């Protein structure tokens, strides 16, 4: 069994077409967490088989640690650490010596063993203020003035009410005035760290989804699911957080009233693509960023997950920013350059940023908005409705991507409520 060494990155903001700085698709050997792995089990195992397998792992790991060869590696390993169960997908993380990893790779119950990896936050770039993104979402793709503060954003007054948007990110400043008490601290996977947003990325993303001024779905609830902190994370924490989100949505009976946003990207990593796919089969919608590499998104995770809604970035005059990924797996295009939203540093703080990190929450907000006004019983129905509303053939330099820009459908409704922001 081949051991794969790929990673996942929280998407950086970029400086637009003036100075795009894409992250490398493949992380270097130094990013691997020594002795730590993600193990995916084969489908169809019974609870008893999984329980027996874990007992076997503990026994083999202990025996190997007791041997001189295992002890000579110099890597302290702790065995199975966390368990992940998403629909019928069973995975676990663990700290294992090399001999135990070899034994795991040969075990008939094991589908794959992937090294865990550090995931890094990149620096953000603050840019001049702009207010075009929301107006674009209700204009049927009509180019809008970049710096105008009088662009109409028209929407149904339900505006995401009764819907929950889960943001797997750096946390959310739930006390920011933009959230009006609709921000919820859900899960913090980072040990010994407060559930706050020290980097701004998660708060920014949440503001585009549900901020009273900057949000697409202005009455939706936003749930903070923190998997990143001081610039670094691992799949151990990302999978834990995604698992928690899926469980929380399921246990709260919110499947048709919840959406997950993932403004993260990295090289193709099958365990996480599998997790997103299993969430879809469980009845949960996930919206993901296409990535900021200026390349085909087919080599990125989670953009390549077949049933995620993958979002590329478009500029105000309907061109693709050079940083935005593209390709047949990009389902839809949404505003992603010079977008203003909430930020860290205070309950009124704002920042203007660029990247597919901004494009993805526009569509996650659109999903929340549509869930509040229409009966969309499944992720398939959600995806079909979002794509049915899109405006075709507007994006210049879309490469071989489906050429569809996001639209909220307001001009086809019987009533239109003009709003200003």
UniProtKB/Swiss-Prot annotation:
Glycosites: 248, 261, 348, 388
Domain Inhibitor I9: 36-122
Range of residues in the leader sequence: 1-16
Molecular-function annotations in GO: serine-type endopeptidase activity
Enzyme class label: hydrolase
Induction: Expression is up-regulated during infection.
UniProt xrefs under InterPro entries: PCSK9_ProteinaseK-like, Peptidase_S8/S53_dom, Peptidase_S8/S53_dom_sf, Peptidase_S8_Asp-AS, Peptidase_S8_His-AS, Peptidase_S8_Ser-AS, Peptidase_S8_subtilisin-like, Peptidase_S8_subtilisin-rel
GO biological process: proteolysis
Superkingdom of this protein's organism: Eukaryota
GO CC annotation, single: extracellular region
Family statement drawn from the similarity comment of this UniProt entry: Belongs to the peptidase S8 family.
The protein's role, per its UniProt record: Secreted subtilisin-like serine protease with keratinolytic activity that contributes to pathogenicity.
Name of this chain's protein: Subtilisin-like protease 2
């Amino acid at each position: 069994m081949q051991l794969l060494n790929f990673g996942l990155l929280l998407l950086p903001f970029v400086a637009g077409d003036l100075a795009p700085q894409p992250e490398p698709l493949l992380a270097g050997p130094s990013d691997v967490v020594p002795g730590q792995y993600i193990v995916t089990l084969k489908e169809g195992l019974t609870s008893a088989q999984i329980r027996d397998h874990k007992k076997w792992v503990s026994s083999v790991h202990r025996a190997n640690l007791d041997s001189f060869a295992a002890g000579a590696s110099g890597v302290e390993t702790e065995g199975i650490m966390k368990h992940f169960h998403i629909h019928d997908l069973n995975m676990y993380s663990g700290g294992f010596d090399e001999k135990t990893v070899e034994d795991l790779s040969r075990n008939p119950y094991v589908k794959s063993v992937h090294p865990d990896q550090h995931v890094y936050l990149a620096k953000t770039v603050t840019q001049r203020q702009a207010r075009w993104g929301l107006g674009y979402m209700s204009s049927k793709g009509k180019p809008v003035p970049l710096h105008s503060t009088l662009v109409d954003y028209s929407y149904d007054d339900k505006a995401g009410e009764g819907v929950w948007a889960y943001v797997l990110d750096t946390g959310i400043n739930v006390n920011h005035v933009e959230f009006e008490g609709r921000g919820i601290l859900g899960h913090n996977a980072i040990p010994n760290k407060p559930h706050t947003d020290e980097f701004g990325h998660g708060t920014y993303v949440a503001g585009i989804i549900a901020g009273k001024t900057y949000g697409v779905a202005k009455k939706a609830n936003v749930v903070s699911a923190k998997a990143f902190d001081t610039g670094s994370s691992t799949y151990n924490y990302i999978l834990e957080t995604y698992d928690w989100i899926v469980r929380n949505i399921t246990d709260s009976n919110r499947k048709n009233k919840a959406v997950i946003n993932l403004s993260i990207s990295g090289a193709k990593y099958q365990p996480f693509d599998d997790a997103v796919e299993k969430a879809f089969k469980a009845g949960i919608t996930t919206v993901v960023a296409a990535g900021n590499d200026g390349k085909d998104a087919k080599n990125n995770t989670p953009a390549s997950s077949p049933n995620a809604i993958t979002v590329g970035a478009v500029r105000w005059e309907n061109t693709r920013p050079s940083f935005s990924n593209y390709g047949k797996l990009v389902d839809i295009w949404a505003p992603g350059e010079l977008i203003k939203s909430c930020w860290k540093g205070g309950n009124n703080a704002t920042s203007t940023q660029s990247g597919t990190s901004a494009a993805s929450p526009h569509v996650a907000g659109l999903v929340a908005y549509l869930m509040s006004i229409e009966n969309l019983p499944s992720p398939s129905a959600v995806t079909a409705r979002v794509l049915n509303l899109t405006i075709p053939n507007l994006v210049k330099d879309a490469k071989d991507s489906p050429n569809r820009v996001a639209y909220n459908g307001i001009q086809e409704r019987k009533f239109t409520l003009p709003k200003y922001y």
